[in-house]
């Protein structure tokens, strides 16, 4: 079943049926003010943190997808009313036509009902601490119409704990008042003039307003039938205490063919409402602000554009996968319809992997995240698994979060910096290849010598931080020389305790190879000697202890008693995705063993919806293996199609030179290819998800937890760097693709260090991998050297 389509010319996904089986969401805001909004205008807004500074209310996992950011319309002659988004009023779809266009950092809603066509475009202007609703109402009938418009949001009590508990305090700690066209919400306990005030205003002079939620909705009613809309007028409620909203009402008389346009502004900060109301009275300022959002993404998307025989790949890489990856870098894992704000902060491994994907489009945020992570590393070398970067930012360390009437304990230094017992064995290693990728992209080698403090005191250069990470993993190994699993590795549910993780040893090797590339560029002989010897030892340990001869693949690890996990003889958890893909991706293993391992991945783990994390799934609890054995079969870490490591398999197959297999893996997970089977997928077809139900679950193929997943960054990085093969070096650009043999070629436009490269890859011999010749601006070359900033360069690569 199909609910919409991709409009590639406008970089929009168009929803033509609003009754999709789950909320399909989008992100508005690229800086501090953010709105997570659904195709029915449900969702919530926050400033910087959805834990401390929630602007509007959200009730997760409700079937109604409410509350939200709503425009109601009422025919004042008949009393009939509806909403510009299908929800919350939900007019019969035989009578009303709705369309939603989710774009990059904006969403457009359109409703055509009973001779009135209305549109509402929501976005967050760059540089503003506010959200703008651009609303237009047109009378398409042949009669004059009197239409009332109501803008509505429900305000939050700011802190997630105040919103969801201890109402005996929060209900009596805020108030609203209406002055000069602005309905201002005062969090009275918060003395901060910025974070202590939210507002809703509009460019019209309101005929009526409400600041009390229950006055607007009415008792025993909800957002579907507010009493104020039913009556055609708000009650001008504004006072202290109880639940609060922002509701503004204006009546318009429209002649046949006449339009009216206005803006509604939702924002943060005392007095800011009047300023922005005055600014956006000139609707050309609304147009300019929206054009700024479009330009923002035009510039980012232009950094890498591909035209290939695979339309789904082009659609996702040219817009949606990059957009999702940037969203994860900015908003981490703390704001979605699943992660609803109770965990503000950065996951170490998540952020380090997110940042590998976007140094070309967002170098400033990539650099910031790297600094955040290095500040969150301790002298011993490991990273703090989950931390608030403000804790270690000297400019923000003394800034307190929004005050709350609910007692929320302030974490002590001991709470912030955990010990080995709570350390995940993989976290710190991801940052090493990400730093290398950043330096290659930007050419900013000075970053490597920048001095950054450790979380537990002292400081070191970035180069020394990288070595500390490598040294920690070299120290914490078992008797076999394989890295200890510690609390967990990348798989949080694989709790090996005193056991050993194959995945982490392969990751250690990959990080070592990345560091050695940097050390060689710096001609650091001492570091080269030390870490080359370390890498050789890791490779030997992996090949000696992790290969399963009977199965022909790499095991997942060993328990604390030395029992192997993931062998041919085992009936549960026989083959695992992480260890086998990273074995090849890292470069630690031979071509022969790599091919065998990936053949096992294909045989045991492949499905039409992507690669399973392990198979067969665990049915018998075993605490020596971990909590993964107590997860339902086919769900999440126990035999689901866990999306994040799927791109590792794409890289592995590309490194093996098997382009057809790499593309088969890519296509199976690509949400674009599931656009016509939403009855199975359920989730958005423009977003990668955390996991898809595995074959051992009755909902096999159902996608869960969209948007905030490391899948997006890895999908982008794997596709652009290894399938399409366009990779940056310290001084050169490499084009070394691995594609399906049937492809005749493809084209890429790549911006790098201010120069533009128009790359044409031609495949006259029908191969998957292997570069026969390279031309740069018509001249045969052995390598593509960095060209002058501002130059346009034609690159032709012949495969053979």
UniProtKB/Swiss-Prot annotation:
Binding site for N-acetyl-alpha-D-glucosamine 1-phosphate: 333, 343, 349-350, 490, 492, 637, 644, 690, 709-710
GO molecular function, one term: carbohydrate binding
Record note on pH: Optimum pH is 6.5-7.0.
UniProt EC number: 2.4.1.280
Keyword field contains Glycosyltransferase: yes
Enzyme active site: 492
Keyword vocabulary terms for this entry: Carbohydrate metabolism, Glycosyltransferase, Transferase
Catalytic activity: N,N'-diacetylchitobiose + phosphate = N-acetyl-alpha-D-glucosamine 1-phosphate + N-acetyl-D-glucosamine
InterPro entries according to UniProt: 6-hairpin_glycosidase_sf (IPR008928), 6hp_glycosidase-like_sf (IPR012341), Carb-bd_put_dom (IPR009342), Gal_mutarotase_sf_dom (IPR011013), GH36_catalytic (IPR033432), GH94_Enzymes (IPR052047), GH94N_ChBP (IPR037828), Glyco_hydro_65_N_sf (IPR037018)
UniProt: N-acetyl-D-glucosamine binding residues: 492, 636-637
Any Pfam family the entry gives: Glyco_hydro_36
Any single GO BP term: carbohydrate metabolic process
SMART domains linked: CBM_X
Domain of life, per lineage: Bacteria
Thermal dependence, as annotated: Optimum temperature is 20-37 degrees Celsius.
Record's function text: Catalyzes the reversible phosphorolysis of chitobiose (N,N'-diacetylchitobiose or (GlcNAc)(2)) into N-acetyl-alpha-D-glucosamine 1-phosphate (GlcNAc-1-P) and N-acetyl-D-glucosamine (GlcNAc) with inversion of the anomeric configuration.
Family in the record: Belongs to the glycosyl hydrolase 94 family.
PANTHER family on file: CELLOBIONIC ACID PHOSPHORYLASE-RELATED, PUTATIVE-RELATED
Protein's name in the database: N,N'-diacetylchitobiose phosphorylase
Organism: Vibrio furnissii
